[in-house]
């Protein structure tokens, strides 16, 4: 049976144990993109096409480019192993965010400026 895992900011963990920062623009404003890759018998299907579309979409949205294939392949292989999909079928979701930002709420009091 496969296990839902996540890799966020350089750390592996279960999807439930890792957290996105609350000020991440993908979380706050849906300012991000994703690709879902079919894993069949431990092999990512159409990976080059998914990664090209991921990169093209980031450029279209004016975002920084996501990591390239040579940086992602070891992580993808590690994810397949960790989620026990080496001889199984499943899905891998790649998310890319514009990053963190601060929503400022101002009033007359300078003390009332908050980053959420």
Q: What are the roles of these predicted feature ranges?
A:
Residues 105-116:
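Single conserved hydrophobic/aromatic residue that forms the stacking wall/gate
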Residues 1-107:
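Conserved alpha/beta cores of soluble small-molecule-handling proteins
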């Amino acid at each position: 049976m496969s296990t839902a895992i996540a890799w966020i900011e350089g750390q592996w963990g279960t999807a439930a144990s890792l957290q996105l920062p609350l000020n991440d623009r993908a979380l706050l404003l849906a300012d991000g993109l994703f690709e879902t890759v079919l894993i069949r018998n431990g092999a990512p299907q159409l990976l080059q096409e998914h990664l090209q579309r991921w990169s093209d979409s980031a450029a279209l949205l004016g975002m920084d480019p996501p990591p390239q294939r040579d940086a992602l392949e070891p992580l993808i292989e590690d994810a397949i192993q960790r989620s026990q999909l080496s001889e199984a079928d499943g899905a891998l979701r790649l998310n890319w965010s514009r990053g963190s930002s601060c929503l400022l709420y101002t009033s007359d009091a300078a003390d009332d400026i908050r980053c959420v």
